[in-house]
């Protein structure tokens, strides 16, 4: 291929390189921890700014926080039910905000300008370990919700409306976290890779509309994840199970 007058720099696009930290017997992904804590810190700073001086007529950041509070409250109430939705608002809100900020942080922050010994920074939700951990938290949460509200009666769900459903309900418990984690991971990673390829090919114009589309899909993915988490919890506490 030496006759080609140019070479596309696709070899510079690498997926899977990691910066590892060794903590005792555990080896963790350092770049995921760094970006996660930076984004969590930015989110906490936003909350502090918005609640530092509360006003009856909310403006600016306070207005944004109150809008988010109302939105998460309505989402939890709709999916979980009037009886226990307040207990689960902090969990659903934390999931939504962390995923939303992580997705948008990956799309808006030029992480690749920060050089690391190995690997590169990016959205925490573009790492399968993060999305699997979030999905497992959701699974543990709806098990806890069902058992805490119904006790051992919760397991009647697995044979409702007929015992034939038992193997299907067990398989469903495995497919729920799989679908949650891989949907979020796949969408965010694909968005980052598409933008990276387009930046190499047409660095000035073409990536911009794709980035805006990525922001939209990132917000949708955060909403889908939080809505499904609330739905699974609501399903576990429903009395007819």
UniProtKB/Swiss-Prot annotation:
Cite the Pfam families for this sequence: ATP-synt_A (PF00119)
Q: What are the transmembrane regions? A: 30-50, 91-111, 128-148, 193-213, 214-234
Name the job this protein performs.
Answer: Key component of the proton channel; it plays a direct role in the translocation of protons across the membrane.
Q: Name one GO molecular function term.
A: proton-transporting ATP synthase activity, rotational mechanism
Its GO CC terms are:
plasma membrane-derived thylakoid membrane; proton-transporting ATP synthase complex
Family indicated by similarity: Belongs to the ATPase A chain family.
Q: What's the chief localization of this chain? A: membrane
> Which InterPro entries does this entry report, sorted A to Z?
ATP_syn_F0_a_bact/chloroplast, ATP_synth_F0_asu, ATP_synth_F0_asu_AS, F0_ATP_A_sf
Tree of life domain = Bacteria
In what way does this protein cross or attach to the membrane? Multi-pass membrane protein
Localization, UniProt: Cellular thylakoid membrane
What is known about its subunit structure?
F-type ATPases have 2 components, CF(1) - the catalytic core - and CF(0) - the membrane proton channel. CF(1) has five subunits: alpha(3), beta(3), gamma(1), delta(1), epsilon(1). CF(0) has four main subunits: a, b, b' and c.
What Gene3D superfamilies does the record tag this protein with? ATP synthase, F0 complex, subunit A (1.20.120.220)
The name under which this protein is listed is: ATP synthase subunit a
Database matches in PROSITE patterns: ATPASE_A
Its keywords, alphabetically, are: ATP synthesis, CF(0), Hydrogen ion transport, Ion transport, Membrane, Thylakoid, Transmembrane, Transmembrane helix, Transport
């Amino acid at each position: 291929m030496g006759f080609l007058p140019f070479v596309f720099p696709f070899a510079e696009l690498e997926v899977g390189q990691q910066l590892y930290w060794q903590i005792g017997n555990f080896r963790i992904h350092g770049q995921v921890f760094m970006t996660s804590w930076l984004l969590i810190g930015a989110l906490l700073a936003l909350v502090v700014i918005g609640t530092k001086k509360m006003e009856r007529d909310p403006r600016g950041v306070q207005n944004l926080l109150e809008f988010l509070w109302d939105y998460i409250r309505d989402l939890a109430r709709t999916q979980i039910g009037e009886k226990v939705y307040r207990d689960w608002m902090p969990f659903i809100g934390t999931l939504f905000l962390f995923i939303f900020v992580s997705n948008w942080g990956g799309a808006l922050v030029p992480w690749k300008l920060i050089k690391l010994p190995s690997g590169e920074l990016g959205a925490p939700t573009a790492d399968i370990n993060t999305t699997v951990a979030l999905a497992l938290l959701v699974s543990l949460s709806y098990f806890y919700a069902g058992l805490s509200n119904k006790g051992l009666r919760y397991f009647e769900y697995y044979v409702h409306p007929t015992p034939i459903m038992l193997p299907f309900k067990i398989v469903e418990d495995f497919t729920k976290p799989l679908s949650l984690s891989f949907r979020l991971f796949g969408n965010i990673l694909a968005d980052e890779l598409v933008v990276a390829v387009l930046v190499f090919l047409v660095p000035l114009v073409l990536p911009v509309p794709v980035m805006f589309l990525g922001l939209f899909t990132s917000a949708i993915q955060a909403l889908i994840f939080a809505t499904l988490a609330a739905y699974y919890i609501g399903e576990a506490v429903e009395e007819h199970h």
